[in-house]
Amino acid sequence: MKELALKYGCNPNQKPSKIYMADGSDLPIKVLSGKPGYINFLDAFNGWQLVRDLKKATGLPAATSFKHVSPAGASVGLPLTETLAKIYWVNDMDWQNFSPLACAYARARGADRMSSFGDFIALSDVCDKDTAMLIKREVSDGVIAPGFTQEALDILALKKKGNYNVIQIDPDYVPAPLEHKEVYGVTFEQGRQELAIDDALISNIVTENKELTEEAKRDMKISLIILKYTQSNSVCYVKDGQAIGVGAGQQSRVHCTRLAGQKADNWWLRQCPKVLELPFKDSISRAERDNAIDVYIGEEYMDVLADGEWEKTFTKKPEVFTREEKREWLDKLTDVTLGSDAFFPFSDNIERAHKSGVKYVAEPGGSVRDDAVIETCNKYGMVMAFTGIRLFHH
């Protein structure tokens, strides 16, 4: 297949639309079901590169959950804990025997479930039965993978009356070294972003604390790979092999750090016993529970706790989750890694990161205020690596 006609471009009025290879060669994909759209393919191709890089860097199966050309979550296939199974709403499944790929998607989807609603999924490995079962129960636009078992295809065929978007990509496809983009009739050309995210990239430790564990190295590389395919400005908080907060597309770096930090905080607050024990009605769906929890742990908690409101969601009225209780729980979050796609211009980013348990930082360096940023890291005993490489993505 040399080209594929699409229903429309970014918006319904943008017609005609298609994807094709400029050199006239065959597309490196097969659409196995559904009719993916323009934005679906943007998510699919960016997501595929991300999980391909994660697999190459870690040796582990990887998954990502994309929305509007940025990852809402991404992870490698480490086993789930009982608590994670609960907050990711998979504790009613045989989660202890999930395949590594299924664990990766459960983590990628579960980190920021509000943002992942209606995601496009990318998988580094052949989609298996376990992963397909997870995908089947979530609201999602589609999935791209290098292959699918027949069991997985049969399961995915049950989504959207057989119209769920399933794309198979050739894992051996290598794009041309130059890429092109057209804006307002003007063609832009640049070399592809083929930077290898490896141990050498994070070897320049500039802080007093230079103790970088193997797990921290892994998480640093994961954060940088995620940023490589996230709309800039971007920062990413990572813990235990998965993104727990991605801040994308903000003009101010500290607002990126705050946004991603709040997402990381929410991920951790969802694990507090007070939240785990919320008395939901049996009729409340997973998506409705996600929405209720998001409000409950935020500042607008009375929107779900006011008389006449809580009865719609809970069997009994929950107690308020006070600021003091939340801070006490957040103080237990430790050993988080923070990556940034460009340098931190001020130390306020580090101050904010500290509140979300950050111990390890990877950023390019190069700010005139690098000394102040390093000093703040030293104040909190953090380990910071200067990569020397910017990772803007647009």
State what each model feature region is.
Residues 126, 205-215, 344:
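Bateman/CBS regulatory modules and CBS-like beta-alpha motifs in cytosolic regions of diverse proteins
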Residues 53, 229, 266-270, 355, ...:
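Conserved helix-loop functional segments at active or binding sites
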Residues 72-113, 244-346:
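Glycine- and Gly-Pro-enriched alpha-helical subdomains that act as flexible
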Residues 70, 127, 239-242, 344, ...:
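Active-site-proximal loop/turn and secondary-structure-junction residues that shape catalytic pockets
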Residues 23-35, 111-117, 191-210, 288-309, ...:
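Gly-rich Lys/Arg/Thr-decorated short loops/hinges at beta-loop-alpha junctions or inter-strand turns
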Residues 57-65, 166-169, 232-239, 269-280, ...:
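Flexible, glycine/charged-enriched surface loops at secondary-structure junctions
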Residues 1-201, 216-234:
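Active-site loops and adjacent core secondary-structure elements that bind or stabilize anionic groups
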Residues 119, 123-124, 137-167, 172-174, ...:
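C-terminal binding/interaction regions
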